[in-house]
Design a protein with these regions (language model features):
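Core segments of cupin and vicinal oxygen chelate
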Residues: 9-48
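Vicinal oxygen chelate
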Residues: 13-16, 66-109
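N-terminal beta-strand motif that seeds the catalytic metal site of vicinal oxygen chelate
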Residues: 1-17, 64-66, 115-120
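Exposed loop/turn and edge beta-strand positions of beta-sandwich/beta-sheet ligand-binding modules
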Residues: 6, 35, 62, 96
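Membrane-topology and secretion signals of cell-surface/extracellular proteins
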Residues: 25, 51, 113-117
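Active-site beta-strand termini and strand-to-loop segments that position acidic
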Residues: 41-46, 102-105, 115
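Conserved catalytic-core motifs of GNAT/GCN5-like acyltransferases
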Residues: 28-34, 91, 117-120
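A short acidic/small-residue loop/turn micro-motif
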Residues: 56, 95, 116-119
Length: 120
């Protein structure tokens, strides 16, 4: 037996606002069901779902962390800035990554990085 795929589903307060945020990061809409308040986003082979209906405490900040691994962290970072997101400068970590961290509109933390050995 094997696990074929794992897709995070993040609880959000406002699905359209969250979709717009992730589009600025370079994701595109694969599926969207406004009547469900749900969307599936993709970036290459990676998938992410956002869903209003699974947020049992809409006034409480989220504490999820999703780590994204682009193949070119510098270009991904520049794209996020070009698309109007306020993102911190890239940092080189003690654990060998070049990365930056941001929160989506619902407080879900995104760590976005590339291994220094991968050329970043």
């Amino acid at each position: 037996m094997k696990l074929n795929r794992l897709i995070p589903m993040l609880p959000v307060r406002n699905m359209p606002q969250s979709v717009a945020f992730y589009q600025k990061l370079g994701f595109r809409i694969e599926q969207r069901k406004d009547e469900w308040r749900w969307a599936m986003l993709c970036f290459g082979e990676c998938r992410l779902m956002v869903d209003e209906s699974i947020n049992p405490h809409p006034d409480v900040p989220r504490s999820s962390v999703v780590y994204l691994y682009p193949d070119d962290i510098s270009e991904f970072h520049a794209q996020a800035r070009r698309n109007g997101l306020s993102v911190p400068d890239l940092e080189t970590t003690f654990y060998g990554m070049t990365e930056f961290r941001i929160d989506d509109p619902d407080g879900n933390r995104l760590w976005i990085g590339q291994s220094r050995s991968a050329g970043a």
